[in-house]
């Protein structure tokens, strides 16, 4: 097939690799514009743009996608289908309907669960044990189109959104190629989503990473895993931000007496922090504002205290 591909970050590159291996003709790659990144705020090109440039595939980076200009440019390339993977923009009807096979989306969840911009992060943060990828026929709603094909994937107890994303991306590439094969053969049966089962994976905000110690330790641990690497998990210690980098539910450690947020040294292991429901979180690695990352024990040694309160 002649494919016009719309995608921006590293997650989308696995789909490009799969399309290339399957012999599909990529007529263009559409990515978001280069953006400032890093401490120096130098312009950084999207991962998909780098992939395309290395192979001589034409790249488009429009600032606007709903003024008709992009639709006209793609229509001139006569693609058989649009493939969208983490592009990061909402597409209008003119784009969704310009190709004979419409627009197919590679989405990082088992729709209708986790519609929206951060499906991988929220699936982990909410403690789910299974997720997957969906190949969807796009419509004008937010991930509301008919499901064409799905593949499931287990979420491991130690998975973070960062470790899970590459596996989902690879699975998405495989599912995409299979869906295109079935589409060409006329063997795909679109399935309407059950809106009653939908959950929203809204865009993450910095404040989502703030730890509420009144939550059970398992819930705090899940959110730490889901929000790694951003926004991470953080609390405060005597008015300074304290990032919690590594932690797990401390089923085998005593819960410190007192209110949620009370922290106590567990010799040789880390800090046990009292959480909701009488549970404890064993914190092993942290970063105090203005300091490099360190073990939780080193933090306590530096403070010369065995017990202190977090969230203050």
Curated annotation (Swiss-Prot):
GO terms for molecular function: methionyl-tRNA formyltransferase activity. Keywords: Protein biosynthesis, Transferase. One of its GO terms (cellular component) is cytosol. Gene3D superfamilies: Formyl transferase, C-terminal domain (3.10.25.10), Formyl transferase, N-terminal domain (3.40.50.170). Its EC number is 2.1.2.9. It catalyses: L-methionyl-tRNA(fMet) + (6R)-10-formyltetrahydrofolate = N-formyl-L-methionyl-tRNA(fMet) + (6S)-5,6,7,8-tetrahydrofolate + H(+). (6S)-5,6,7,8-tetrahydrofolate binds at residues 109-112. It holds the Pfam family Formyl_trans_C. It is an enzyme of class 2 (transferase). It comes from the Bacteria. The keyword Transit peptide does not apply. InterPro entries: Fmt, Formyl_trans_C, Formyl_trans_C_sf, Formyl_transf_N, Formyl_transf_N_sf, Formyl_transferase-like_C_sf, GART_AS, Met-tRNA-FMT_C. Belongs to the Fmt family. Attaches a formyl group to the free amino group of methionyl-tRNA(fMet). The formyl group appears to play a dual role in the initiator identity of N-formylmethionyl-tRNA by promoting its recognition by IF2 and preventing the misappropriation of this tRNA by the elongation apparatus. This is Methionyl-tRNA formyltransferase.
């Amino acid at each position: 097939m002649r494919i016009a591909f719309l995608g921006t970050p590293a997650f989308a590159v696995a789909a490009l690799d799969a399309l290339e291996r399957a012999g599909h003709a990529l007529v263009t790659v559409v990515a978001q514009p280069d953006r400032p990144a890093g401490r120096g705020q130098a312009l950084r090109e999207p991962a998909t743009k780098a992939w395309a440039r290395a192979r001589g595939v034409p790249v488009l980076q429009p600032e606007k996608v709903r003024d008709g200009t992009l639709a006209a440019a793609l229509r001139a390339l006569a693609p058989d289908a649009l493939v969208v993977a983490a592009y990061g923009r909402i597409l209008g009807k003119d784009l969704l309907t310009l190709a004979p096979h419409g627009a197919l989306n590679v989405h990082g969840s088992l729709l209708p669960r986790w519609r929206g911009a951060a499906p991988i992060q929220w699936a982990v943060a909410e403690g789910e044990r299974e997720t997957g990828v969906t190949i969807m026929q796009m419509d004008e709603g937010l991930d509301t189109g008919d499901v064409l094909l799905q593949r499931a994937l287990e979420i491991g107890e130690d998975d973070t959104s960062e470790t899970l994303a590459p596996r989902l991306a690879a699975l998405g590439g495989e599912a995409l190629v299979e869906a295109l094969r079935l589409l060409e053969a006329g063997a795909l049966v679109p399935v309407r989503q059950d809106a009653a089962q939908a959950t929203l994976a809204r865009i993450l905000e910095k404040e989502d990473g703030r730890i509420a110690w009144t939550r059970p330790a398992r819930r705090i641990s899940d959110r730490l895993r889901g929000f790694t690497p951003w926004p991470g998990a953080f609390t405060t210690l005597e008015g300074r931000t304290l990032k919690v980098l590594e932690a797990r539910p401390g089923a085998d450690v005593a819960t410190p007496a007192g209110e949620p947020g009370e922290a106590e040294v567990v010799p040789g292991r880390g800090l046990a922090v009292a959480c909701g429901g009488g549970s404890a979180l064993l914190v092993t690695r942290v970063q105090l504002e203005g300091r490099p990352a360190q073990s939780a024990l080193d933090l306590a040694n530096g403070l010369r205290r065995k017990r202190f309160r977090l969230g203050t």
